[in-house]
Regions:
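Generic recognition of cysteine residues
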Residues: 25-28, 50, 70-71, 123, ...
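Residue-level marker of intrinsically disordered, low-complexity segments enriched
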Residues: 9, 32, 39, 103, ...
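Long, charge-rich boundary regions
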Residues: 48-119
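C-terminal, charged low-complexity interaction regions
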Residues: 120-163
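N-terminal cysteine/histidine-rich coordination modules
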Residues: 1-61
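Generic structural hydrophobic/aromatic packing signal, biased to beta-strands
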Residues: 20-25, 29, 47, 54, ...
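Arginine residue identity/basic-tract feature
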Residues: 3-7, 11, 17, 24, ...
Length: 163
């Protein structure tokens, strides 16, 4: 049996480099979040297909590359690390949640696991295979990318438990 342990990761844990659709050529591009010395966050768009590199504003953010219709909803991920996180969560038959150690009242809903949509985290997920197939197709859509442009995949602990 596969086990997933909540490590209290937040959505911002995955948002330092996003895979997006290039607004100029439609190919897969990336947006890097850069924190300046003044504390200002900048978004730098880079596309290896059309060789564009420019700063973009928050409100001009291109659509995510890793998104597809799934189970009547949209499954999306910022990057492959985020996609792997979702995949490991969906695959797991045992999901362990823990409270935020800094939270005085116990549980906190800052954890990405607690903020996943209900259709994705349902324990009796009848659409598990469909979700995993969509994840696989999203992963394959980004296989052609240069490995130096992709974020390192997360080392999400998924354990095998003896029955």
């Amino acid at each position: 049996m596969l086990r997933f342990r909540d490590r209290q990761e937040t959505l911002s844990s995955f948002g330092d480099r996003d895979l997006v659709k290039c607004p100029h050529c439609g190919a897969c591009a990336q947006v890097d979040l850069i924190l300046s010395l003044q504390g200002v966050i900048k978004h730098n768009l880079t596309c290896q297909t059309c060789n564009i590199s420019k700063e973009i504003g928050y409100f001009n953010y291109p659509s995510l590359w890793l998104q597809a219709p799934c189970c009547g909803n949209t499954l999306w991920a910022y990057n492959l690390k985020h996609l792997e996180f979702i995949e490991m969560f969906v695959k797991a038959r045992l999901r362990e949640y823990k409270s935020d150690p800094g939270e005085t009242l116990g549980w906190s809903n800052r954890s990405l696991v607690l903020r996943l949509p209900q259709w994705l985290k349902s324990c009796r997920n009848y659409h598990k295979e469909e979700i995993l197939n969509v994840i696989q197709s999203l992963r394959e859509s980004s296989l052609h990318l240069d490995s130096c442009t992709l974020p390192q995949l997360a080392k999400i602990q998924l354990e095998v438990i003896a029955n």
